[in-house]
Amino acid sequence: MKTLVLGASGYIGQRLMEAMKATSWVVPIGGSRSRAAALPETGSDSILVDTLDAKALATALEGFDAVVNCVAGDARSISEGARVLAGAAIAAKCPRIIHLSTMSVYGPVEGLVTESSSLDPGLGWYGRAKCDAEAHIAEFVRQGGQAIILRPGCVFGPGSELWVGRVGRWLRTGRLGDLGVGGDGWSNLVNVDDVCQAIMAALQLPLSAGELTAFNLAAPDSPRWNDYFVDLAIALGATPVKRIGSSQLRLDSFIAGPPLKAAQRAMKYIGRSLALPDPIPPGLIRLWAQHIKLDAAPASRNLGIQWTPYGVSMQSCVNWLSGKDATDTHNLSKVICTR
């Protein structure tokens, strides 16, 4: 199966290309906007393609059996990119789209959430863009295409700057720890390799023309945020684990966060690399307290995912993180951010 992977230079995209290359039934081609973001380390083929250029994308999709949309970035890249992809796939007669969405499409809802739960764009620009993107994929299906939408929770594992590297640095510097009621929300963590499993199973899932299905992705044994923070802190030797009150957390996020973010942008603009503390986005404070639990039973049943045990995932994260200098500068531009 000849498959184009859009966003192949990102965290999930790179891991997916490696997993696909190890199979005999799929021929993966990575799609990237720039030559610098190509994938020489994977040994796989790649092409240059602008996902916001309808004509170029339609040309690129000719002859492909499926396309996997792992594109991250700003709201336009997510929403408009999905609209362009839907039209390009129709024009190129590419029959199937595997679209990577997010649990953020469910908004601030709490409790057990299934794929039939209502979408709510109320969590900010990211949730709105992802809801819009899903609507564009649905339009592709209405025109006769086949689509599988995957809605992962927080994708982590070795190499995850967002949910491992950054969290580890906060723990080591005492800015994060046991958050009390502020960290009692379910983490909905899912190993990046399990997301890749789901994508490859979705490529082979029997579907008819004009059929759309969606799957939540979260490990059944994913813990509450407090448990994850304490487990990671102990494994890294960031002890004693501090109890962080809501006032301290909010001061860090709302007072220190904006100037830190501005400094990051300034350094990027002038092309300089400088180790700065990671700002804590306000959206994460909401997420850590949100009692949302993804029901991933349909993914287990229909995609046959063999979920990576939490302990195994944790060990691989610690092994990766322990080999890094916590003062290194880090590039978060290529990871999928759920807030």
Go through each PLM region and give its residues.
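Short-chain dehydrogenase/reductase
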Residues: 75, 123-134, 154-157, 161, ...
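Catalytic helix-loop patch of NAD(P)-dependent Rossmann-fold dehydrogenases
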Residues: 110-156, 177-178
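Conserved Rossmann-fold cofactor-binding substructure of NAD(P)-dependent oxidoreductases
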Residues: 45-64
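N-terminal Rossmann NAD(P)H-binding glycine-rich loop of SDR-like oxidoreductase domains
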Residues: 3-23
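Amphipathic terminal alpha-helices
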Residues: 289, 294-304, 308-339
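NAD(P)-cofactor binding segment of oxidoreductase domains
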Residues: 67-100
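Substrate-positioning beta->alpha
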Residues: 161-166, 182-204, 212-213
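Mid/C-terminal beta-alpha module of Rossmann-like enzyme folds, strongest
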Residues: 205-279, 296, 335-339
